[in-house]
């Protein structure tokens, strides 16, 4: 497939669309320097003038490189595309390769060798990265990470127009217009200026409280504190603001007097057999003894009951348990209590181990009381002989058969 304008790349003459009249000399001027083609360059390099020979040698080297590049199967197409006026962002490509002017003009032409600009870019990028890392170390614990945008350089020295490309919008590719470095976001008070909904100043309509673990609402939608809301939910009415007084220990009734001791203060009013009111002390005394309480037992103060839990019951209970344990396990022996076994062996601690003869008592001294409830035929055998036994094997004698719960008397050594 043939592309228009690409066939001329294989020739040694400059392309018409790449030729600038101000940069390319006329054929008459160029004949004095070198003729067209490498033959002319070779002839010029053999000149007697040292300056002319040096210039001709450099031009010949560049000409051969350009010829090798243009005759290679790979073509550089982007200068041709940039030179087309119909493409957006295209710019005329000045062909400095065919003229006697300087290789690096001051126009917007892209130089062929970008070693110096790339080195400058790398140096500036390295400095920028170092500054950015220093800022990261400085504000590592800072909650406002958006202030890092101020560490970016103010502007980049190279723009898109220097390479013939279209310029991108600055808010996306310019550090000054990026969101990180904008004044609105890099301010230390950025978080405080966010459009958050202000916290409403709530107040309980019943008690006026402004702080509560949980805000509730009444039937009309007004705010209630947690206490008032729970009270209203349980009782269906507002919580009283005045706390109720403590329950009076002494019960006073206007005009009420004990018919036995004539006292007017008591913790509980009672009635006697005839229905007359009596104090608590006289009423209890009459209930227990069926006689009136003597007046000599009257006291001015009211004796209250000490309702604190005492540890006497616990001590008694512990002593009872200790006595029972001593009865079950006398010194020098032990008892085995076992229920009925499906195998018919009572007092069997393990498979192949029976406690029925007095001759084997020395094997089980020092074990203490052992209580086994329920069938014991499922127990696993002991892993080995008991410590302290003079023999190396367990007795396997026959055990007495029984079907009811039995207690073996303590064995004597």
Swiss-Prot record:
Q: Residue ranges of region Required for interaction with ZFPM1?
A: 203-222
* Annotated phenotype, changing residue 205 to G: Disrupts interaction with ZFPM1. Binds normally to DNA
Q: Which residues form the signal peptide?
A: none
Q: Which GO terms describe its biological process?
A: animal organ regeneration; basophil differentiation; bone mineralization; cell development; cell population proliferation; cell-cell signaling; cellular response to cAMP; cellular response to follicle-stimulating hormone stimulus
Q: Name one Pfam family in it.
A: GATA
Where is the stretch described as Interaction with CALCOCO1?
Answer: 249-315
The UniProt entry's GO CC annotations, sorted and at most eight, read: nucleoplasm; nucleus; protein-DNA complex; transcription repressor complex
Q: What one GO molecular function would you report for this record?
A: transcription coactivator binding
User: How changing residue 207 to P affects the protein?
Assistant: Stability of binding to DNA reduced
Q: Where in the cell is it found?
A: Nucleus
Q: Which PROSITE patterns match?
A: GATA_ZN_FINGER_1, GATA_ZN_FINGER_2
Modified after translation how?
Highly phosphorylated on serine residues. Phosphorylation on Ser-310 is enhanced on erythroid differentiation. Phosphorylation on Ser-142 promotes sumoylation on Lys-137. Sumoylation on Lys-137 is enhanced by phosphorylation on Ser-142 and by interaction with PIAS4. Sumoylation with SUMO1 has no effect on transcriptional activity.
Q: Which UniProt keywords apply?
A: Acetylation, Activator, DNA-binding, Isopeptide bond, Metal-binding, Nucleus, Phosphoprotein, Repeat, Repressor, Transcription, Transcription regulation, Ubl conjugation, Zinc, Zinc-finger
Gene label: Gata1
Q: What does this protein do?
A: Transcriptional activator or repressor which probably serves as a general switch factor for erythroid development. It binds to DNA sites with the consensus sequence 5'-[AT]GATA[AG]-3' within regulatory regions of globin genes and of other genes expressed in erythroid cells. Activates the transcription of genes involved in erythroid differentiation of K562 erythroleukemia cells, including HBB, HBG1/2, ALAS2 and HMBS.
The record, for InterPro entries, names:
Transcription_factor_GATA (IPR039355), Znf_GATA (IPR000679), Znf_NHR/GATA (IPR013088)
Q: What is its main location?
A: nucleus
> Quaternary state and partners of this protein?
May form homodimers or heterodimers with other isoforms. Interacts (via the N-terminal zinc finger) with ZFPM1. Interacts with GFI1B. Interacts with PIAS4; the interaction enhances sumoylation and represses the transactivational activity in a sumoylation-independent manner. Interacts with LMCD1. Interacts with CREBBP; the interaction stimulates acetylation and transcriptional activity in vivo. Interacts with BRD3. Interacts with MED1, CCAR1 and CALCOCO1. Interacts with EP300. Interacts with CEBPE.
Effect noted on mutating residue 204 to R:
Disrupts interaction with ZFPM1 and binding to DNA
From the Swiss-Prot or TrEMBL record, give the protein name: Erythroid transcription factor
Where is the stretch described as Disordered? 29-49, 297-325, 391-413
User: Tissue expression, per UniProt?
Assistant: Erythrocytes. Expressed (at protein level) in liver.
Which effect does the record note for changing residue 178 to A? Loss of phosphorylation of the chymotryptic peptide
Q: What is known of its domains?
A: The two fingers are functionally distinct and cooperate to achieve specific, stable DNA binding. The first finger is necessary only for full specificity and stability of binding, whereas the second one is required for binding.
| ZnF GATA-type: positions | 204-228, 258-282
* Residue ranges of the region described as Interaction with MED1 and CCAR1: 200-330
């Amino acid at each position: 497939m043939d592309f228009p304008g690409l066939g001329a790349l294989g020739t040694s003459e400059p392309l018409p669309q790449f030729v600038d009249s101000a940069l390319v000399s006329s054929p008459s001027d160029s004949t004095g320097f070198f003729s067209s083609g490498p033959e002319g360059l070779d002839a010029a390099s053999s000149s007697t003038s040292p300056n002319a020979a040096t210039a001709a040698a450099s031009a010949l080297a560049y000409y051969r490189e350009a010829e090798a590049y243009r005759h290679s199967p790979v073509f550089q197409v982007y200068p041709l595309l940039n030179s087309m006026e119909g493409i957006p962002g295209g710019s005329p490509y000045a062909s400095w390769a065919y003229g006697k002017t300087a290789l690096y003009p001051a126009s917007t032409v892209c130089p062929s060798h970008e070693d110096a600009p790339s080195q400058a870019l790398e140096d500036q990028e390295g400095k920028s990265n170092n500054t950015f890392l220093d800022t990261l170390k400085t504000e590592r614990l800072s909650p406002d990470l958006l202030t890092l945008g101020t560490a970016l350089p103010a502007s980049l020295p190279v723009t898109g127009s220097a390479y013939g490309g279209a310029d991108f919008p600055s808010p996306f590719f310019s550090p000054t217009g990026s969101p990180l470095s904008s004044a609105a976001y890099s301010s230390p008070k950025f978080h405080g200026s966010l459009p958050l909904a202000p916290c409403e100043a709530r107040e309980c309509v019943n008690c006026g409280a402004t702080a509560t673990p949980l805000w509730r609402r009444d039937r009309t939608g007004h705010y209630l504190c947690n206490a008032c809301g729970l009270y209203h939910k349980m009782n269906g009415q507002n919580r009283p603001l005045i706390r109720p007084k403590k329950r009076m220990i002494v019960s006073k009734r206007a005009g009420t007097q004990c018919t036995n001791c004539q006292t007017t203060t008591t913790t509980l009013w009672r009635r006697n057999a005839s229905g007359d009111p009596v104090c608590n002390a006289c009423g209890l005394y009459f209930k227990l003894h069926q006689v009136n309480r003597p007046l000599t037992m009257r006291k001015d103060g009211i004796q209250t009951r000490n309702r604190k839990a005492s540890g006497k019951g616990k001590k008694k209970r512990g002593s009872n348990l200790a006595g029972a344990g001593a009865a079950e396990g006398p010194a020098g022996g032990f008892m085995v209590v076992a229920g009925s076994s499906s195998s018919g062996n009572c007092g069997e601690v393990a498979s192949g181990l029976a406690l029925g003869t007095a001759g084997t008592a020395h094997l089980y001294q020092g074990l203490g009381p052992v209580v086994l409830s329920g069938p014991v035929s499922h127990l696993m055998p002991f892993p080995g002989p008991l410590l302290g036994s003079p023999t190396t094997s367990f007795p396997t004698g026959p055990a007495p058969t029984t079907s009811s719960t039995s207690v073996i008397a303590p064995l004597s050594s």
